Amino acid sequence: MARVLKVAAASAAGLFPRLRTPVSTVRTSASLSSHPGAGPVWNLGRLNHVAVAVPDLEKARAFYKNVLGAEVGEPVPLPEHGVSVVFVNLGNTKMELLHPLGSDSPIAGFLKKNKAGGMHHVCIEVDNINVAVMDLKEKKIRILSEEAKIGAHGKPVIFLHPSDCGGVLVELEQA
C-alpha cells in the first residue's frame, strides 16, 4: 500500500510541477507594486476564526462541546454589534458562533434567509488595520464601515464587502 501511495504521489508531482515548487507568500501590498517601497505596507496574518450564524446558541454550544468534545466558551452578549457570541477553540483557530441579540441584528436578517444557519464570515488578522484600510480603499475594495470598530476580541475590526471578496464576507482584525 505504501508503494502505491509513493507511485501515486510521484505521478501527481509530475502532472503538477507547481506542487514541488515553493509558493512565495504575498506578504504586503507594497510587494505587488512595480515600484519597490511604494504604497503602504501591511501584512496579512493567520486565520483568526470562522463565524457561523446559529438559530439556537445553546444547541450549537452543546453540539461542539458534548458531541465533538471541543473547548467551548460561555455566551458573551455584544449589544453594540447586535449579537451574542460563543467561541469554540479548535486548536490552531476558532469558530465563532453568532446568535442575534435583538430583532434589528444583522444576524437576525441572515437567519431569516438561512433558517438553519450557516457560515457568516471569515476573520483574518492583519498587523496594521489602519494602513490596510487605506490600501484597500485605494484598490477600490469596499469597506462596510467608515472606520474600524472594536470587535469581539476587544481589537479593531473592519468588514470587506462580499462582492469584492469572491462572495465571502471578510473581517480583518488587528493582530
UniProtKB/Swiss-Prot annotation:
Catalyzes what? (R)-methylmalonyl-CoA = (S)-methylmalonyl-CoA
Q: Where in the cell is it found?
A: Mitochondrion
Tell me, in one coarse class, where this protein mainly resides: mitochondrion
Q: Which Pfam families match?
A: Glyoxalase_4
* Enzyme Commission identifier(s): 5.1.99.1
Q: What residues bind Co(2+), as annotated?
A: H49, H121, E171
| Domain VOC: start-end pairs | 46-175
GO CC annotations on file: mitochondrion
| GO molecular function ontology, one term from the record | metal ion binding
Question: At which residues is N6-succinyllysine found?
Answer: K113, K149
UniProt cross-references to CDD domains, sorted A to Z: MMCE
Against PANTHER family, the record matches this protein to: METHYLMALONYL-COA EPIMERASE, METHYLMALONYL-COA EPIMERASE, MITOCHONDRIAL
Q: What is the similarity comment for this entry?
A: Belongs to the methylmalonyl-CoA epimerase family.
Q: What does this protein do?
A: Methylmalonyl-CoA epimerase involved in propionyl-CoA metabolism.
Q: What is this protein called?
A: Methylmalonyl-CoA epimerase, mitochondrial
Q: What is the lineage of its organism?
A: Eukaryota, Metazoa, Chordata, Craniata, Vertebrata
Q: Which gene encodes it?
A: MCEE
